[in-house]
Regions:
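Double-stranded beta-helix
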Residues: 30, 95-115
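Short beta-strand His + acidic residue motifs that chelate non-heme Fe in jelly-roll/DSBH
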Residues: 65-66, 82, 88-93
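A short glycine-rich, His/Asp/Glu-containing loop-to-beta-strand
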Residues: 11-45
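Short, conserved beta-strand element in jelly-roll/cupin
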Residues: 36-37, 49-65
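Short acidic-glycine-tyrosine-enriched beta hairpin
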Residues: 69-84
Length: 115
């Protein structure tokens, strides 16, 4: 067991100046904190998919979630689930959005971007 206080054990990922992503993981479970400070977005991010299951908690802000051909309006405190291989994307609707994401299995592609 390990206790992480104030995100000291998180790895920071290189993204861009307007997106801050931190990650911590076990063998089969990954937890990320992602902060968008470039909103509101004019257009949604390009759709993407991955073999990982994802559950995300909207910790701050407001966004639109697009999953396949469906659109959802999400506010602080809402949660969304994305099954494996479904096309999905988001569009931030406020200046700042913070998401807490869980992935299983872990996103090896994220670890390759950490420093």
């Amino acid at each position: 067991m390990e206790v992480v206080k104030h995100e000291e054990g998180f790895e920071k990922l290189e993204t861009n100046p307007n997106i801050n992503r931190k990650v911590i993981h076990l063998k089969d479970l990954m937890f990320t904190v992602i902060e968008f400070s470039n909103g509101p977005m004019e257009m949604p991010d390009p759709p993407h998919n991955h073999p990982h299951e994802q559950i995300s908690y909207v910790a701050a802000g407001k966004l639109k979630l697009f999953v396949e051909d469906r659109e959802y309006l999400l506010n602080e405190g809402d949660v969304f689930k994305v099954e494996s291989n479904l096309n999905h994307s988001i569009q931030t609707l406020t200046e700042f959005v913070k998401l807490i994401d869980g992935f299983s299995p872990i996103r090896e592609d994220f670890l390759k971007r950490s420093h």
